[in-house]
A protein has these predicted regions:
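Acidic, surface-exposed loops and disordered segments
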Residues: 1-217
């Protein structure tokens, strides 16, 4: 499976089988996180065999069951933190999909995580991780015209990027992002209000860049 296939096949999964993640897959995820943290300055952490965080009333209310592994998206407080966590967190989530694992972005439906949060840092959200009991289902998406703008005929690479962005997971499926092509540059912004819209924007930007081969401002 390549990363484009992973974007198409990754769906949110909330219920997990009682199956341990193999050591080689753990190592691959840890190696990727090390690269990401060096590149981004974030402090993303992965917690294996830690069931307490999702053994809570909030987690069960959110219909999470069997979650024993998760990724904690942590970084220094700042205006760009949420977007960076979305961008780099999805990079890990897609690697997990390539490795045959399942994931789900989790905002509030969990208990206290075991991540180590240093002074001046903040935990933005978590990503549940493991072998899902199902592969999840596709979410409904907005029309391409609702999340993109161009002042010229839409290039094929831009179309591919927007299509991939529409496959990005967003909080309560809100998809409050906009991609605009101006000249040869792409700008992505949040429009409207909502929970975790900046995190959603980061996820969508990563999808766009992977599928289009172009950077987004």
């Amino acid at each position: 499976m390549d990363i484009l296939q992973a974007i198409e096949e990754r769906h949110s999964v909330r219920q997990y089988a009682d199956k341990a993640i193999e050591q080689e897959k753990r190592q691959a995820l840890c190696d990727e996180l090390k690269k990401i943290n060096t590149e981004s300055g974030l402090n993303i952490q992965i917690l294996f065999d830690e069931p307490q965080c999702f053994d809570s009333m909030m987690a069960h209310y959110g219909k999470f069951f069997g979650v024993k592994n998760y990724i904690a998206l942590v970084g220094k407080k700042g205006k760009s933190l949420e977007e960076k966590c979305g961008y780099y967190g999805e990079r890990v989530a897609l690697l997990a999909q390539i490795l045959g694992l399942n994931t789900c972005w989790v905002a509030m439906s969990h208990g206290k995580s075991a991540a180590k949060i240093e002074r001046g840092e903040k935990q933005v959200c978590l990503i549940a991780l493991g072998y899902g009991k199902t592969q999840g289902v596709a979410h409904k998406s907005k029309a391409m015209s609702e999340v993109s703008k161009t002042d010229v005929a839409m290039p094929d690479w831009f179309k591919k990027g927007v299509e991939a962005a529409l496959l990005a997971p967003t909080a309560i499926n809100q998809q409050k992002f906009m991609f605009e092509l101006s000249g040869d540059e792409v700008f992505a912004t949040v429009y409207g209000f909502g929970f975790y819209v900046k995190t959603d924007l980061g996820i969508a930007k990563y999808h766009f860049e992977v599928a289009s081969g172009r950077s987004v401002k």
